[in-house]
Each structure stands twice: as structure tokens, then as C-alpha cells.
């Protein structure tokens, strides 16, 4: 798949290939917790599983177990392994949890920080996301596989509210099947729901998360989150790869009109330290409207001049026919640019900087109805305790060209937030 490479040395966890019983237990238990949290907001008490007919010995094992011979146990394990389908060995299960606290100096009366994507709750501890990923990876010609990302948490409504306008705290973030046709180096097809190819930043998961805790303005207001459809990707060489897709549009499980959107990506690696992604998506996105095309051109560049320094650049330009709120009947345009720098001071401690500006010339993307410009600067130190646990702090300052940011019972042109974030990856 054509995604940008990791910008810094992150918590790196390969797909877990635990035994079938462990994987089934983990998946079932996690799904049960997610469903229980959604349905009732409480976790059910654990149930006793030992039968009265097989009481436990002092060692914690049942008498039936202690009577078994080692040879019997080994034979039973061998028979069980032989009975399982071969694809079970390829099944991988991974998990990702992000939780945080954030405080907004503007102290908005509604408790919501303005123009934030996922970190919008002021003065609150939040479970941003808990994610379980189950997959069989397709990696070579003739391989077939699938991936399902189950996600729950406070950040999920920001994604699901754009899908038929229904917000929920549970989402199939991704769910797609894959096949690599034996053509050349391998022509890959993915069918289902998948995250967008646009943008420098990503929706977090076990196999990738951003250097900053909060998301950029470009991530939230210039580009889509997800797509549902089909895409084909092909690596022409080690330096050039491409992808094309036909999808329902922006963040839609079910299309809202009769037209489809088309996307494309050209990935270039001219030299080892530099990667450039040229992205585009276009098509009608308004409900019951097959004529007002929306086009977004997206540039991502990543340069790693040393083993400890990563530089990034993201630029976006968008246009939609006849939707301006400033000049009704005219086309709406928006544009933005973001710069990134991440420096690893040690193998465990790093510091990330981000600066960006976003101009919504026709008031459509930010929803102000005016020609608004919003800029921000963010500092994020991070400490990796283990390969599975990361702690981050963050200070962010937002500045607008007009009072559009909530402050107590009024509006202001700036806001400052501080946050602490813990990530667990398995």
C-alpha cells in the first residue's frame, strides 16, 4: 500500500502472530468490552469458568489436568494444531490505545476547543481511541488477505459524523479485502473501506501515528478522512509507484449522489533520504448533486537528512464548483501549507515542531461564511518508555485573522492549549 513512511522512530510493533486460542480470546474479549461500553457504559464482571465437577488442586490446575501424562498433552496439542486451517498461522492481531488530558486557556463555556479535530474536549480526561486490528497481510503476487480495524472512543464521532451525518463512538475505521495479481512486480487491489491517501498526517493506529498529539488544520479541514470503494496500486520500480481509486467520495459508506469520485497518487523516491507524494481526488461530493465537482491537490514531502532529524512539508489546494459562502454562485477555494521538524535527542526522547496556515477564502471549510485564515504552532516532546508505551506532552497556539475561536461566552482570535497523552501499542 502507498502510505507515507514513518516520520520518526516510533513505537514499532510487528503484527502479533500468537497462537490461535490466544488470538481468539484477545479478539473476543476486546470486542465484548467494546460492545459492553457502547451498550451500557460498564464492563461486565468476569465469570468463573471452572466446573464444580473438576475442582482445582493447590497448584491451580484441575485434578483432571494433573492426571494427564506429558506425552498425552503433547499428542493433544499436535492434533489440535493439525486440525486448524493453515491460514490461521497468518492471522495477526494488534491493538492501539490513546488517552489524554487537555486544557484550553480560553475556557470555552461549551467545553469544546474550536477547530480541533480529535482533541476538542477542554479540561477533560479522554479515551481518544481504543483500536483492535485483525488482518491477514497480502505481501506478494497471488496473495489474498484482509484487514479490519475496529475503533471506539471520543475521537470516533469526528469521523463517523460525516458518514450520513450520524455520529457514533464505534466505527469500522477500515475494512477491506486485498489481492495481489501476478502481473509484473504485483498489481495490488484493495476493496472496501480504507483511510485516505491524502495528507502528511494519518488516523492513528498500531502501525503508525503522528509526531504531534493534536491534528493539523489541513488534516481536519482540507482533505477527507476515509473512502469506500476500490483501488489499485503498482510499484514500477524502487523509486516510482502509483495508485488509482474509484470511491463513493469523502467519508461516505454509502454514496450521496449518482457520481463517483476518482483519486490518484504518484509516489517518488528520487534519493534514499527523500520521499515525495503527489495526491489528487476529484468528483461531486454534495448530496443529490452530480455537477458541483470538488477537487483537492495534495503534496507531501519527507526528508530525512540524518538518522535523528526528519523534515516534512504538506501543501493543499482545494476547489468546489458554485459553493462559495462569500460570493454565492461562485466557486469555493481553500489552501494551506504545513511544515514539520522532528529531532530525536536520544533513542527514547524526541521533540516535534509543527507550523501551518490555512486560508478558507470562501468560508466553506471552516464554516465561518467569511474569508478566514487560521494558523497554528505546536511543540510536542515525546518519551518512549518501552516499545509499547509512549508519553507525550504538547503546547499549541492558534491564531486567526478574525474572532472565530470560542472564549468563555464570546469569541476571540487566538487560543492556547496544553495536553498530555499516553499511547499503548501492541
Identify the function of each model-found stretch.
Residues 1-21:
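N-terminal secretory signal peptides that target proteins for export/translocation
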Residues 2-7, 26-115, 426:
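N-terminal periplasmic/intermembrane-space "pro-region" immediately following the signal or transit peptide
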Residues 48, 118-119, 156-159, 163-165, ...:
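Outer-membrane beta-barrel pore domains
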Residues 89, 93, 140-142, 154, ...:
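Short coil turns and loop connectors of transmembrane beta-barrels in diderm outer membranes
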Residues 104-125, 155-271, 275-284:
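Surface-exposed coil loops of outer-membrane beta-barrel proteins
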Residues 117-154:
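Glycine- and aromatic-enriched membrane insertion/assembly motifs of diderm outer-membrane
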Residues 124, 140-141, 222-227, 250-259, ...:
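Solvent-exposed loop/turn segments connecting transmembrane beta-strands
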Residues 130-134, 175-177, 230, 263-264, ...:
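Membrane-embedded beta-strands of outer-membrane beta-barrel proteins
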Amino acid at each position: 500500500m502507498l502510505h507515507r513512511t514513518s516520520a520518526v522512530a516510533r513505537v514499532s510493533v510487528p503484527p502479533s502472530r500468537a497462537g490461535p486460542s490466544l488470538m481468539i480470546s484477545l479478539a473476543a474479549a476486546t470486542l465484548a468490552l467494546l460492545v459492553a461500553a457502547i451498550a451500557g457504559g460498564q464492563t461486565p464482571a468476569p465469570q468463573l469458568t471452572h466446573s464444580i465437577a473438576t475442582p482445582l488442586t493447590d497448584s491451580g490446575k484441575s485434578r483432571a489436568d494433573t492426571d494427564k501424562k506429558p506425552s498425552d498433552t503433547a499428542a493433544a496439542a499436535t492434533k489440535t494444531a493439525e486440525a486448524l486451517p493453515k491460514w490461521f498461522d497468518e492471522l495477526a492481531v494488534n491493538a492501539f490505545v490513546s488517552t489524554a488530558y487537555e486544557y484550553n486557556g480560553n475556557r470555552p463555556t461549551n467545553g469544546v476547543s474550536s477547530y480541533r479535530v480529535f482533541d476538542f474536549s477542554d479540561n477533560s480526561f479522554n479515551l481518544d481511541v481504543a483500536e483492535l486490528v485483525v488482518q491477514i497481510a497480502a505481501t506478494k503476487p497471488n496473495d489474498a488477505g484482509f484487514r479490519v480495524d475496529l475503533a471506539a472512543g471520543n475521537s470516533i464521532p469526528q469521523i463517523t459524523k460525516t458518514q450520513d451525518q450520524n455520529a457514533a463512538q464505534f466505527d469500522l475505521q477500515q475494512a477491506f479485502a486485498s489481492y495481489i495479481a501476478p502481473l509484473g512486480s504485483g498489481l495490488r487491489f484493495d476493496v472496501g473501506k480504507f483511510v485516505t491517501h491524502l495528507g502528511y498526517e494519518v488516523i492513528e493506529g498500531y502501525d503508525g501515528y503522528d509526531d504531534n498529539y493534536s491534528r493539523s488544520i489541513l488534516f481536519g479541514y482540507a482533505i477527507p478522512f476515509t473512502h469506500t470503494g476500490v483501488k489499485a496500486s503498482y510499484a514500477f520500480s524502487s523509486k516510482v509507484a502509483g495508485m488509482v481509486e474509484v470511491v463513493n467520495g469523502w467519508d461516505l459508506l454509502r454514496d450521496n449522489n449518482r457520481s463517483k469520485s476518482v483519486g490518484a497518487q504518484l509516489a517518488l523516491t528520487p534519493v534514499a533520504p527523500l520521499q515525495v507524494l503527489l495526491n489528487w481526488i476529484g468528483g461531486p461530493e454534495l448530496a443529490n448533486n452530480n455537477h458541483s465537482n470538488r477537487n483537492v491537490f495534495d503534496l507531501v514531502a519527507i526528508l530525512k537528512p540524518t538518522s535523528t532529524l526528519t523534515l516534512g512539508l504538506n501543501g493543499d489546494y482545494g476547489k468546489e464548483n458554485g459553493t462559495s459562502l462569500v460570493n454565492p454562485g461562485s466557486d469555493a477555494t481553500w489552501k494551506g501549507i504545513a511544515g514539520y521538524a522532528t529531532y530525536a535527542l536520544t533513542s527514547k526522547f524526541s521533540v516535534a515542531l509543527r507550523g501551518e496556515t490555512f486560508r478558507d477564502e470562501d468560508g466553506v471549510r471552516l464554516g465561518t461564511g467569511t474569508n478566514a485564515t487560521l494558523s497554528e504552532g505546536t511543540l510536542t516532546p515525546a518519551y518512549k518508555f518501552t516499545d509499547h508505551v509512549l508519553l507525550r506532552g504538547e503546547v499549541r497556539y492558534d491564531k486567526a485573522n478574525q474572532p472565530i475561536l470560542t472564549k468563555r461566552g464570546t469569541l476571540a482570535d487566538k487560543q492556547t492549549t496544553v495536553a498530555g497523552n499516553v499511547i499503548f501499542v501492541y
